[in-house]
Amino acid sequence: MFFMDISGQRMLVIGWGKTGVASARFLISRGARVVVADEKNLSLENDVLSKLGEDHGQSVELADYGISALAQVDAVVPSPGVPPFHPVLKEAVKRCIPVISELELACRYLQTPMIAITGTNGKTTTTSLIGEILSGSGRKVFVGGNIGTPLVEYVTGPQTADCAVVEISSFQLQWVDQFHAFVSILLNTTCDHVNYHGSFEAYRAVKERIFNNQGKQDVAILNADEPDSAVLAESLSSPVFFFSTTKMVERGLYQEKDRLICLDGEGKQEFYPLSMIRLPGAHNVENVMAAILASRACGCSPENVINAISGFSGIAHRIEFTREIGGVKFYDDSKGTNVGAVKRAIETFSDPIILLMGGRDKDGDFETLSALLQDRVKALVIFGEARERIQERIGGIVPTVLTPSLKEAIAAARRQACAGDVVLLSPGCASFDEFADYKARGRFFKEEVRAFA
């Protein structure tokens, strides 16, 4: 922990969502003077703003959502969704005003050992599963970060957990310096958020910051099946444990037929049956392996690990079975907001798929799905803002229908489907053209499907 004295400092919080509010609350609790700027016009009568001031006997200032907000500011705390090329952040860097992410801010005060999980896909499942394993082993656990409760909200309180299991996005890693986790996991990196980071190379480099400041007493966990994972491992200061579904590893966990074999690098072996995994898809075997390695690093027994995994049925909106109607199975994978996630979802099924894709484009490389569409997909239904771009890239490979909205896409998919088919919502895009977030999109899908019965 690298303590940061912010008492009396004038701190600019950019963005007034869940993370911005939690950051402001923490800063005020530490005696900072908080200034808030948001693209939506806030007023001091805002319920949350006024309550923050009342609770701590200190008013919160409002600033314009522009460069003028930097006047007499000591540091800037941007919400994760504020891109690094935002004019205020670029100007702050130019003026040498520190830019500190919520994650970095929390880590400066965190007194609980942290397991940090990042990757393009699988973060939430892996984070949740690690939390289940540790809880089942008798540990008091905080689970949060990019899911649920922001880490800065946890450090605002008494920090009573034995371990903090934290999902971390590339947005949160953008502005870190002293960040440190005793176990850091990088699940995978496929093309995503290029419109935020500028390039895939920049995105991947930010993801790799999850290993910042690790030493010999820490643990790094990497996917051996990812390109350049061996090169990355050579650059790390911490011991590296690999996981693989395709090949043996010297230290870590790998799949062999119907079991997982864990090697500690010193001759000791442990075995885990594949039958314990209830989650569909080969990608979830990878998530489970990463969770096992993290849990073993915390001293959990194989028995507790197996018990927790056997009872874990997955997370909402991640290839979640919704309903079977007339022999057609409907699955909600609304969390599949990038092309890599769509690929993994398609590979989960052997039955013919009616695939629903669309929403707000994130510069996805849709062409990489072409071979899978030919092999696995019976029909493609495209919806939302991205429908024309998706149509240009992969429309026509299989029978394709374009619709303006998800509601119409669901109806079209039902008309296309026959007994034995799978209707899969795996959008490959963000949800913000129609919905507040991927959860709202997934709930809408399930409501529409259930209304068919």
From Swiss-Prot:
GO MF annotation, one: UDP-N-acetylmuramoylalanine-D-glutamate ligase activity
Main localization (coarse): cytoplasm
InterPro entries per UniProt: Mur-like_cat_sf, Mur_ligase_C, Mur_ligase_C_dom_sf, Mur_ligase_cen, MurD
GO cellular component: cytoplasm
Top enzyme category: ligase
Alphabetized UniProt keyword annotations: ATP-binding, Cell cycle, Cell division, Cell shape, Cell wall biogenesis/degradation, Cytoplasm, Ligase, Nucleotide-binding, Peptidoglycan synthesis
E.C. no: 6.3.2.9
Pathway: Cell wall biogenesis; peptidoglycan biosynthesis
Any single GO BP term: cell wall organization
Pfam families xref list: Mur_ligase_C (PF02875), Mur_ligase_M (PF08245), MurD-like_N (PF21799)
Signal peptide: none
Catalytic activity: UDP-N-acetyl-alpha-D-muramoyl-L-alanine + D-glutamate + ATP = UDP-N-acetyl-alpha-D-muramoyl-L-alanyl-D-glutamate + ADP + phosphate + H(+)
Residue sites binding ATP per the record: G119, T120, N121, G122, K123, T124, T125
UniProt-annotated location(s): Cytoplasm
Protein role: Cell wall formation. Catalyzes the addition of glutamate to the nucleotide precursor UDP-N-acetylmuramoyl-L-alanine (UMA).
Family: Belongs to the MurCDEF family.
Protein's UniProt name: UDP-N-acetylmuramoylalanine--D-glutamate ligase
Species of provenance: Syntrophus aciditrophicus (strain SB)
Lineage: Bacteria, Pseudomonadati, Thermodesulfobacteriota, Syntrophia, Syntrophales
